């Protein structure tokens, strides 16, 4: 029994938490084999996937930056076109205002010319009518004056030349009397 105790004592001196040496060696060999396979085959695939993702992300960022730059350029172009359109609209409004004022001035000038023409035509017509009326009145007055003169004088004024001279003298005397009475007022 003492021998059993000694064997048990020897067995007890061994730490139960530590594995046997052969287990450690085989574990290291397996770890190296798995590590080699992982390093040779699996890790490059992970790196390839990560590189592709990084490239996609970088490409996406680059495309986003390009799109943002294009949008910024388009916005600047839009703003420039808008400013140009506003300037052009202001110029068109100013041109329209100027043309409107010119048209109004032309229409006023035409209206004034038309008015002057109508007034001149009316004055000419009045002068012509006045001359016609004066001529008709002179003729009537002449006949009436000759008739009265024949009755007053008692002789016939059959001679046209005498008649015309007498009528003209009478009318001239009437004009002078009318002018003197108008100047006296």
Swiss-Prot record:
Pfam families reported for this sequence: ATP-synt_B
Residue intervals passing through the bilayer: 24-44
Keywords: ATP synthesis, Cell membrane, CF(0), Hydrogen ion transport, Ion transport, Membrane, Transmembrane, Transmembrane helix, Transport
Membrane topology (UniProt): Single-pass membrane protein
Major localization listed first in the record, in broad terms: membrane
Keyword Transmembrane helix (UniProt): yes
UniProt similarity note: Belongs to the ATPase B chain family.
Protein known as: ATP synthase subunit b
Organism: Rhodococcus jostii (strain RHA1)
Gene label: atpF
């Amino acid at each position: 029994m003492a021998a059993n105790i000694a064997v048990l004592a020897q067995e007890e001196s061994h730490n139960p938490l530590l594995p046997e040496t052969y287990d450690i060696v085989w574990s290291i060999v397996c770890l190296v084999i798995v590590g080699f396979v992982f390093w040779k085959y699996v890790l490059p695939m992970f790196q390839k996937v990560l590189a592709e993702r990084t490239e996609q992300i970088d490409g996406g960022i680059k495309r986003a930056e390009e799109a943002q730059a294009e949008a910024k350029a388009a916005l600047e172009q839009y703003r420039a076109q808008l400013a140009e359109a506003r300037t052009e609209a202001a110029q068109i409004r100013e041109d329209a205002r100027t043309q409107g004022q010119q048209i109004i001035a032309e229409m006023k000038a035409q209206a004034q010319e038309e008015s002057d023409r109508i007034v001149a035509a009316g004055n000419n017509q009045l002068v012509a009518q006045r001359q016609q009326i004066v001529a008709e009145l002179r003729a009537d007055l002449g006949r009436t004056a000759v008739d009265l003169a024949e009755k007053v004088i008692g002789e016939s004024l059959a001679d046209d030349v005498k008649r015309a001279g007498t009528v003209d003298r009478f009318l001239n005397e009437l004009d002078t009397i009318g002018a003197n009475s108008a100047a006296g007022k």
